[in-house]
């Protein structure tokens, strides 16, 4: 009997998969891997071709065509989202820079699946939009798109600019790998506070005795001098964060305004993982430059609404840096000033954004739910309405 039921479930999934098709309301990206090879690795790129059919939708242009596809490489990406779902996220590297769907020219993009987003695909969408609204220095651009991989419709995806050092993204000097010149290692850093220990990183012990992981994105390979510099910098920040809360010394090394804006965005959406993983910050070249928090990235843990009043008070994740930072009166005064101004003059516009997203995504979300019935967002109106309710209580 169990085998029979399993067979029925398999056949249902197969029939559903084959029956699902793109909605025709969003551009469609066609990807063909070499020899139809399956994408099974996050480490190794596969050769592939692609083209984007804009379907005549206003504001978008075709890229390549079925008869003249363009070259690219593709691999898996993500951690839990890669392991935990059949609908996979991907990282793509184009052979030539392209302005995909009106975004700045680049070779580097992600196709985010958001299979874990049961809030109407709004977790990242709202988080990114709030980041733009509140004035973060750069926020990744996103375009919803439907994807056909090796002839198979795989649903609604979000074509997203990846975080990298670039004049159109994190606009700082790019520090060379294995640099040894003391004057050149003071900046050009892009670092992530990470909750995974599977990428090149350094670790320090926090003031509370917990270990904190810093994955360095740029540079990617460190000399002894670079590793020493980064370790010293993170140790100094940690010491100051756990030090005298009435001292202003921390703000000589950290951009208080950027951190306050970053923090407010995370609080609005109740992203309880925000200072534990996918927490990016960077430092420009120069002896007196400061560490700047941002850009925002992963809002997969947003809108869960823990019982804690503030994100750092929840027990789901270890986020003691922000918990300590919020004890600094000067920081909280700056947060209140930005929040009051933002709330009075701009915050209500987020509801126009969610309304527009509902209109834009509804039919594609239905097609996606047909393709992935286990974790789709078929009733988009109900789910986005819930997000609006949560935003009103932020």
Map each language-model feature to its residues.
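Positively charged n-region of N-terminal signal peptides that target proteins for export
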Residues: 1-4
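Short, solvent-exposed loop/turn and secondary-structure capping segments
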Residues: 42-43, 62, 83, 102-105, ...
């Amino acid at each position: 009997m169990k085998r029979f039921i399993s067979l029925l479930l398999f056949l249902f999934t197969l029939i559903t998969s084959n029956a699902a098709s793109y909605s025709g309301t969003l551009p469609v990206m066609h990807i063909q891997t070499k020899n139809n090879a399956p994408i099974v690795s996050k480490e190794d790129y596969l050769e592939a071709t692609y083209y984007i059919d804009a379907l005549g939708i206003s504001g978008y242009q075709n890229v390549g065509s079925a008869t003249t596809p363009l070259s690219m490489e593709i691999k898996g990406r993500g951690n839990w989202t890669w392991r935990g779902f059949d609908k996979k996220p991907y990282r793509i590297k184009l052979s030539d820079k392209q302005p995909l769907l009106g975004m700045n020219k680049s070779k580097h993009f992600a196709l985010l699946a958001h299979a874990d987003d049961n809030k109407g695909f709004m977790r990242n969408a709202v988080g990114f939009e709030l980041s733009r609204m509140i004035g973060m220095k750069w926020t990744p651009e996103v375009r919803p798109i439907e994807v056909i991989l090796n002839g198979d419709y795989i649903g609604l995806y979000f074509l997203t600019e990846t975080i990298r050092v670039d004049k159109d993204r994190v606009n700082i000097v790019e520090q060379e790998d294995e640099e040894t010149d003391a004057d050149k290692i003071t900046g050009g850093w892009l670092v992530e506070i990470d909750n995974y220990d599977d990428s090149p990183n350094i670790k320090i012990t926090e003031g509370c005795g917990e270990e904190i992981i810093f994955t360095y994105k740029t540079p990617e390979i460190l000399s002894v001098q670079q590793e020493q510099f980064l370790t010293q910098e993170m140790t100094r920040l940690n010491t100051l964060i756990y030090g005298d809360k009435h001292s202003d010394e921390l703000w000589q090394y950290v951009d208080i305004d950027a951190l306050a804006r970053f923090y407010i965005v995370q609080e609005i959406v109740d992203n309880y993982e925000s200072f534990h993983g996918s927490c990016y910050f960077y430092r420009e070249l120069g002896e007196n430059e400061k560490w700047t928090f941002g850009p925002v990235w992963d809002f997969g843990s947003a809108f869960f609404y823990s019982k804690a009043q503030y994100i750092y008070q929840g027990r789901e994740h270890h986020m003691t840096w922000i918990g300590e930072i919020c004890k600094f009166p000067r920081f909280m005064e700056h947060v209140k000033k930005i929040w009051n101004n933002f709330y009075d003059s701009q915050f209500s516009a987020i509801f126009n954004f969610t309304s527009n997203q509902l209109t834009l995504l509804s039919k594609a979300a239905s097609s996606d739910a047909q393709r992935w019935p286990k974790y789709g967002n078929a009733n988009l109106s109900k789910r986005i309405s819930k997000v609006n309710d949560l935003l009103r209580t932020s």
